[in-house]
Amino acid sequence: MFIYGDNEQLKKELKKLVIDSGLTQKEVAEKMGVKPQQYNNIVNKENLAFRDVKRIAAACGYELQIDFVPAEQDE
């Protein structure tokens, strides 16, 4: 689990997820049903769609879970 900060952080987490899965980017693309160039276009977009994040996670054998928690309040 990680706390979302921004899209750059999310992209780094996705790259780590792919590495941890033991799959190559080409294999992830194949499991997603897209060409490797399309996969690169997806992960290099400025704003990732939740749908794309979910598809990448699933291709790597993971499930995307989203949880909302109360923000910490500064006193």
Question: What residue ranges belong to the model's regions?
Answer:
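Short alpha-helical DNA-recognition segment
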Residues: 22-40
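Short, charged recognition helix plus adjacent turn
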Residues: 2-5, 22, 67-75
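C-terminal edge-of-domain segments
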Residues: 57-70
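The alpha-helix within a helix-turn-helix
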Residues: 18, 29, 57
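A short, Lys/Arg-rich alpha-helix, primarily the initiator
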Residues: 1-21
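Key DNA-contacting residues within the recognition helix of helix-turn-helix
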Residues: 15, 40-41, 54
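Short, basic-rich loop-to-helix N-cap that marks the start of a DNA-contacting helix
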Residues: 45-58
